[in-house]
Amino acid sequence: MNANKNKGKSFERFVAKHLSSVFNLNFERIPNSGAYVGGKNVSRASKLTEEQLLLCDGDIIVPKELSHICFECKWYKEFSWQKLFKNKGESHLNKWIEQTEVTTKRMWFIIFRINRQGEFVCFSSDYNVTFPGSYFECKINDKFYSIASLDNFFESNIGYMLRICS
């Protein structure tokens, strides 16, 4: 197995452990995650039940209490932050958002780590979340997205996320 796949899997495990700790619920990395219903395989989703989709949508298996939420995980060496100040956005982020919006109908969060820069969370600016610190809003293809530090983000939004899923 190549180093990049191992790096991605370890970050997915990190995110699952972090979310489990925050929500006091069980989150697990999806075994063999990697676009089972995403990308070229998006047509598979129409054949699956809601329960089956929970097991293969995103990179993290969510507990039933948060079944309306999808988590994608990414770990990259570099990220061109300066490109976010242009309406075109950053190529990695653009691709992640496009893939996520095509493959899931649920509320989604893209959690990503950039080497030597930290962990961040990206999501639609339409969500009514609380920001525990500063955040950045960018416009990509005429839609607005927010990016915030992962630090205390989900801790600050436990109630909101559980409410929208009930």
What are these regions (language model features)?
Residues 23, 56-70, 78:
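Active-site beta-strand-loop-beta-strand hairpin of nuclease catalytic cores
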Residues 3, 73-90:
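Short beta-strand-loop-alpha-helix junction that forms the active-site gateway
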Residues 59-61, 74-76, 80, 115, ...:
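Anionic group-transfer/hydrolysis microenvironments
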Residues 89-100:
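Well-ordered, non-membrane alpha-helical segments in soluble/globular domains
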